[in-house]
Amino acid sequence: MEVATDQPRWMAHHAVLNGQHPDSHHPGLAHNYMEPTQLLPPDEVDVFFNHLDSQGNPYYANSAHARARVSYSQAHARLTGSQMCRPHLLHSPGLPWLESGKTALSAAHHHNPWTVSPFGKAPLHPAARGGSLYPGTGSSACPSSSHSSPHLFGFPPTPPKDVSPDPGPASPPSSSRLEDKDSIKYQMSLSEGMKMEGGSPLRSSLAPMGTQCSTHHPIPTYPSYVPAAHDYSSGLFHPGSLLGGPASSFTPKQRSKSRSCSEGRECVNCGATATPLWRRDGTGHYLCNACGLYHKMNGQNRPLIKPKRRLSAARRAGTCCANCQTSTTTLWRRNANGDPVCNACGLYYKLHNVNRPLTMKKEGIQTRNRKMSNKSKKNKKGSECFEELSRCMQEKSSPFSAAALASHMAPMGHLAPFSHSGHILQTPTPIHPSSSLSFGHPHHSSMVTAMG
């Protein structure tokens, strides 16, 4: 019978938390407090929030329970220390392993104001930072700092050694119910929270709140380890270091300088004044490329008289083989005596060291259709691929000219993270952004809803 009575209460309260209850804001309050007349009766609210006081500390009506809680807190502080935080599972109202709404609410709100997570962050939605759960506390300089950690990174309470909970009157149902609505509505898992934080433009409005809260917490908040946008693009790609900039103008100057230095040179062997590469002989004199290579390979100077050209096939028309007396061959060779022989007789003598027998003589010349080897095929394919790649690069090089790249890289110092232009590189955004970041596009609310 107890379950039957608790179920309609939970269903009614869950409907209010989901936003089905009409919201009416008090005109005289800056925070989003709701009229007490439109809230649930205090006896129904006590079903879920009877363990919290106005300071957010556990409240127990029975003195025996309070003494047990204090002794447990002191023992827990001695064991763990005031600087130890133990992560637990994130609270989400839609998880199937939560048996009842009462367990979810008690786990989500059982946090003290001095239990501060070093990774605590403000809620991402602007409505979640409108009011505070505990309006009467003097230490809450940041409105949503004391209960922002359960939204993304929840930690169990770790009380200090010298602090004990102060029992006080129960909190008014208006502020508790409003904060319950915000926390249930905007709780999310870790992956969703990180995705929203990386892409949501609302982080810039939350930065001043995080800086104010960092001075009041015993544990400092996690700093941003990614530099700002203007620091990132200062030395990475300077427009002057790209193609066509001042660095590329160094090449023609160097070439002209080398040409001017080599104008008075002359090869000491052949007297040439123009050569692709100047060399030196053993005494330090300049040689042209041809004479220098000849001297390096043969150890003597290159002869100035050109050697006689080999006799052409027409001039050797009357030549016949000394072995088989044939006059048609693809290549003339010489035997040991120096006499000309045909290709077949010369190869036979070279292989068997005897003269080729006349019975093997044939009227026609047998030729083979040589197949292209795999190595030459690979070399040919590689050269073709390289030529095709170079041709494609030349065709597509116009959009990536130096002027286009310089125009892309120039405004990167003040580029906003949500710009929709076609930049090659986008500036990284820090995890905790500074308040100086500005977002120039007015349609970020639709982006947040689409990403969520």
UniProtKB/Swiss-Prot annotation:
> What segments bear the compositional bias annotation Low complexity?
139-151
> What would be one Gene Ontology cellular-component term for the protein?
nucleus
State where composition is biased (Pro residues): 156-172
Q: Which CDD domains match?
A: ZnF_GATA
Q: Give the start-end ranges of region Disordered.
A: 130-182, 426-452
- Keywords, sorted A to Z: Activator, DNA-binding, Metal-binding, Nucleus, Repeat, Transcription, Transcription regulation, Zinc, Zinc-finger
Q: List, in alphabetical order, the Gene Ontology terms for molecular function in this entry.
A: DNA-binding transcription factor activity, RNA polymerase II-specific; RNA polymerase II cis-regulatory region sequence-specific DNA binding; zinc ion binding
User: One Pfam match, by short name?
Assistant: GATA
Q: Which GO terms are recorded in the biological process aspect for this UniProt protein?
A: cell fate commitment; negative regulation of transcription by RNA polymerase II; positive regulation of angiogenesis; positive regulation of miRNA transcription; positive regulation of transcription by RNA polymerase II
Keyword set includes Metal-binding? yes
Entry's localization field: Nucleus
Zn finger limits (GATA-type): 267-291, 321-345
- Please name the PANTHER family in this protein's record: ENDOTHELIAL TRANSCRIPTION FACTOR GATA-2, TRANSCRIPTION FACTOR GATA FAMILY MEMBER
- UniProt protein name: GATA-binding factor 2
Please name the taxonomic classification of the source: Eukaryota, Metazoa, Chordata, Craniata, Vertebrata
Q: Which gene encodes it?
A: gata2
